[in-house]
Amino acid sequence: QTNQGFLRNCNQAAKAARGKYVMFLNNDTQVTEGWLSSLVNLIESDSTIGMVGSKLVYPDGRLQEAGGIIWNDGSGWNYGRLDDTDKAKYNYVKDVDYISGAAILLSTALWKQIGGFDERFAPAYCEDSDLAFEVRKAGYRVVYQPKSKVIHFEGISNGTDGNGTGLKRYQVENSEKLKEKWKEEFKNQCVNNGNPNPFRARERSMGKKIIVVIDHYVPTFDKDAGSKTTYQYLKMFLKKGYVVKFLGDNFLHEEPYSTTLQQMGIEILYGDHWATGIWDWLKLNKDEID
């Protein structure tokens, strides 16, 4: 048997899948506790979710990607690359344009319906972005799960030189193929003006209303009536389709309540820097908040 490259190897191996889900995990990764169960729990929590993926972290602890962004010009971002993985904006469940194929999970039925990775992108690169667009075309969402943390030794498998002789050279070529295939869909992506604000692009909130809720602290909804009321309001906003941000006046990340809200898709603005940073954040994003 010969190595057919990432894409064709995945397509070939997935033909043998007999389980409910197909999980793709790169051979240059190291998983952490709960990485798989958190993916499965998320995809099983909502029938509109078609594919889920992990938070990717470099071996030195810095963030590699908290979901990916595709701009209207076809350019892409690994959102949060080289930043602090513990920042609030990287730790809530959210829709994303794509998730790098180093760690993604989707149902076997949907995988077969789509037909697997599109072989025009063989041997590798952009097949994961393309798959995400195919999942949405089929009527499902692509969602990032921060609780699934996977360490990715990026570059070890495929090299790092985009213009060299390794597989990385296909990155530029396949980017053009991706733009051509999805040129109509790209018209609805967030605009790259040279220095774009990723506020909406990072969570595919284009066309949605965004609400910021400020209270004394993260609602301890099983302890007091006020918190329970706030919690019910937050759930109501989500049900109505709002994108919800929450700021506790004490700027704390309080468990298990903070994680509960984050897993519902609420971004919690926690950390001491928010005591002064909230004003800069509001100034930067004021036109996006309803």
Protein language model features and the residues they cover:
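A short, conserved alpha-helix in the catalytic core of glycosyltransferases
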Residues: E33-V40, N91, D95-G115, R120-I151
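Catalytic metal- and UDP-sugar-binding loop of GT-A-like glycosyltransferases, i.e.
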Residues: L25-N27
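N-terminal strand-loop element at the rim of the active site
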Residues: G241-L269, H273-T276
